[in-house]
Regions:
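Beta-strand elements of repeat-based all-beta scaffolds
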Residues: 2-412
Length: 412
């Protein structure tokens, strides 16, 4: 199918662009969409011609406020006519008639954003479509604050993280962030549930706080996000961890049960590549990259017990060629291929299913998956027991004739 603009013509007072997505090469049918534009060149109405279950056209009105924001009011789509292509100049009446007849909904056929009266133009309130939200005064409300040190609701802890060794990270709760150091967005949804999002000066989320009210008591469910000096995410501390933190105390990822069971921890090399990931309840997973920043080796905790590494070796174009398991002795914190570009090349190497590898030697390698590109010569080179004739091309009159060089750049 192709999207081909076939008309750009003025009609009435508005220009429009008609696009047809053909479903076959006869161009006898297809999906047609028309977009009308106002005098300023902004889309004002989109029509999906004849796409409803009764071949009616689906209309999508687009309106703007005084500052040309198209999301201040987002009208619901409606069906009208039979394969109609003309712009509906009285869409508000058509919209009201459609929803009143089909859904008994007579007002508020749109969602609405209410903006604050400031040059920042931030959203203050959001209403969903339908009159029920209005009658219940149920909207999503936003307010914009800053943190206050020591305040029960607007306080944010400050952390210091150090790496003691390859598998140990120490976390220290170093008091509170200074007042007005962080921006806070308070969100109250339609059910009066409140979420606070704290961001630093680099627009990074450092704390997400969900306030829970239960039998007159209030609980802050805090998720902290910790970054290093290079803005890399170092740790995520969910509520099960943050609830047990005490100001002035230090915690080790090896000895703290809550950190080991619930925290997300990350390690990086000198090039800011993530070389270590610790998920809740899991051992560290290590990653090793080559000079071209391609992931070559990875190892889970279970593989580490067996002395195994998982490898994925690319060709010169960066395409994965062979994947499997090996038993190399690798120190992920002293990368042996840091300054080496690893690549695969097609040969008649039967042990690696038709590939030879430069840049790294594989010990006791077991290839689990091999991928081939560009042509079908691998049938002669991969050393498998598959009969070559079973992989030969068979012409079929129901399909187009094969173009012999069409596989260039593709996986075969």
């Amino acid at each position: 199918p192709q999207n081909i603009p076939i008309e750009i013509l003025p009609i009435g007072r508005d220009n429009y662009i008609s696009t047809t997505n053909y479903l076959d090469n006869t161009r006898s049918g297809g999906r047609k969409e028309i977009t009308y534009y106002n005098g300023l060149g902004y889309p004002s109405q989109k029509i999906e011609v004849g796409t409803s279950n009764k071949n009616k056209s689906i209309y999508h009105p687009i309106v703007y406020d005084n500052l040309l924001r198209d999301d201040a009011k987002s009208y619901l789509p409606y069906a009208q006519g039979s394969n109609t292509e003309m712009k509906d100049w009285k869409f508000t009446e058509s919209l009201q008639d459609f929803y009143a007849f089909n859904y008994k909904e007579y007002t508020y056929h749109f969602s609405e954003k209410v903006y604050e009266d400031s040059p920042l133009g931030r959203v203050r309130e959001v209403y969903g479509p339908g009159s029920d939200w209005r009658s219940q005064k149920a909207s999503t409300k936003f307010s914009y604050l800053s943190n206050i040190a020591g305040n029960d609701t607007l306080n944010c802890l400050r952390f210091e993280m150090t790496e003691k060794d390859n598998q140990n990270m120490e976390l220290k709760v170093a008091g509170n962030c200074k007042s007005s150091e962080l921006s806070v967005t308070r969100t109250e949804n339609e059910d009066r549930q409140v979420t606070l999002e704290f961001k630093n000066k680099f627009d990074q989320v450092v704390l997400s706080r969900q306030i829970e009210h239960n039998n007159g008591s209030k609980t802050n469910n805090d998720t902290y996000y910790l970054y290093d000096e290079f803005d890399n995410l170092k740790a995520v501390l969910p509520p099960m961890v943050s609830a047990q933190l005490v100001s002035g105390s230090s915690y080790s990822s090896q000895t703290s049960a809550s950190l080991a069971q619930y925290a997300y921890l990350y390690k990086y090399d000198m090039r800011n590549r993530c070389i270590g990931t610790k998920l809740p309840g899991c051992s560290w997973e290590y990653k090793v990259y080559d000079l071209a920043d391609r992931l070559i080796f990875s190892q889970t905790g279970e593989q580490r017990k067996r002395g195994e590494w998982q490898f994925a070796l690319p060709d010169a174009m960066g395409r994965e060629c062979i994947m499997g398991i090996c038993k190399n002795a690798i120190d992920p914190f002293n990368n042996p291929i840091l300054n080496t570009c690893v690549k695969c090349e097609r040969t008649d190497n039967a042990s690696l299913l038709g590939y030879s590898v430069t840049g790294v030697a594989l010990n006791s390698a077991t290839v689990l998956t091999a991928k081939y590109y560009d042509d079908y010569q691998f049938k002669m080179q991969n050393g498998t027991l598959i009969s070559n004739s079973s992989l030969n091309y068979e012409a079929n009159s129901e399909f187009g004739e094969r173009y012999t060089t069409s596989s260039q750049g593709l996986q075969t």
